[in-house]
């Protein structure tokens, strides 16, 4: 089997206007970025308001492992399969961040014969959306320090500035810095730090905004500092929102690309699910729903993170509701959750598979607790044995009364996921229950955190450090107590310990810090050792990425 990059380069791509025709998007509504990428015009999107919406399919996964699960690959394969069985389907994905591309993960455009293309452009600069978000965030940072430099009329307390800087890169050296050094002309020295762009509240606002007006209003609500008498200061107070909206105007238009089979995909926005809310933009999702029978979208990492936030944050704010949910699992990842070392995964091990099944079992039960119908998509790898697949299907049937379907979209494209597509349609067109949430917004923030920890993570309780407790009390006092919560924790475990695999129970969820995201409309809860600025691994992917003798990129996949 050729590599992902070889498969992508061998593909014959359709002109983007032909892809747009499948969704009924006219040429005049496209802003082309070359032959195979386009943005969809704001005015055309506004014209869709009030149109009936198709069915929404959410793709999530078990707790990820270094073995890889293939959630994006499954999302693409499922979208292609739905088109193959006669449904007009579009995929809605997040844009990749440069940090993971050059760090540990590599590219994020699917794999094998289930990819979105042109994948090199998608994985790198794409249409410049992340640059626009980084620039808007940086403009706000500059305006804050400029306001303080010129007399500080708002009486901002330089010890209580919450607005950190961002860059779309994994760079641990920037987590904590000193700024404005070098003399009076450079401003007032203070401690500062950088987060990765995908953790920026601008990114969250970008992905939750309904339109440009909503974007600007949300930006204005962002709390960036406190005054000396402990009153909140917003971006509207420093008059940043108009210029920031100008920088984001074109970026807010969704990006249209295609799969290897020529089917449409909207790729827009990219918050991580372990340190942000992990969903693509509301604008892209709504656009897909108004243009297609089925919109297939993914939520980052496992269902305890991305799917929970998709429901408790994105669906709560927008009224969206998935008609069916696919939980992606792999034989090898379940064996890792059952205690097998990565180097031993190729050997058949039914005992470890059954032990690791506890992870999938909890994710399925968690998704069902929201009132959503579930099917398990088993992403097939060539090392898997027939006995392992048979045992997993048996476990799903007997212990969960849920169907598990082996999918071979990586090797076969949409044809390898037709059975999954049929199951998704059956669930989506079947009986639907009301959507329920993990908590009610009327409860205190601490109660919301505890509800997620105990109901979804299997924890005995939460443990809030004193700094976080003080900040939470302040949020309640300032009127932010009814906001939902966005849990920032390791993606590798239901606990805050990334080495605790499977389905641990009875642990404590440690809350180290909290951050207010008033514009996005949630409180970020930082648990355990999770960082909002990742670092590079000992051997980063960047070590092997280069241009070959023909000027083509090598090593991105």
UniProtKB/Swiss-Prot annotation:
Pathway: One-carbon metabolism; tetrahydrofolate interconversion. Keywords: ATP-binding, Ligase, Nucleotide-binding, One-carbon metabolism. It is an enzyme of class 6 (ligase). The keyword Nucleotide-binding applies. Its EC number is 6.3.4.3. ATP binds at residues 65-72. One of its GO terms (molecular function) is formate-tetrahydrofolate ligase activity. Gene3D superfamilies: Domain 2, N(10)-formyltetrahydrofolate synthetase, Formyltetrahydrofolate synthetase, domain 3, P-loop containing nucleotide triphosphate hydrolases. GO terms for biological process: tetrahydrofolate interconversion. It catalyses: (6S)-5,6,7,8-tetrahydrofolate + formate + ATP = (6R)-10-formyltetrahydrofolate + ADP + phosphate. It comes from the Bacteria. It holds the Pfam family FTHFS. InterPro entries: Formate_THF_ligase (IPR000559), Formate_THF_ligase_CS (IPR020628), P-loop_NTPase (IPR027417). Belongs to the formate--tetrahydrofolate ligase family. This is Formate--tetrahydrofolate ligase. The lineage of its organism: Bacteria, Pseudomonadati, Pseudomonadota, Alphaproteobacteria, Hyphomicrobiales.
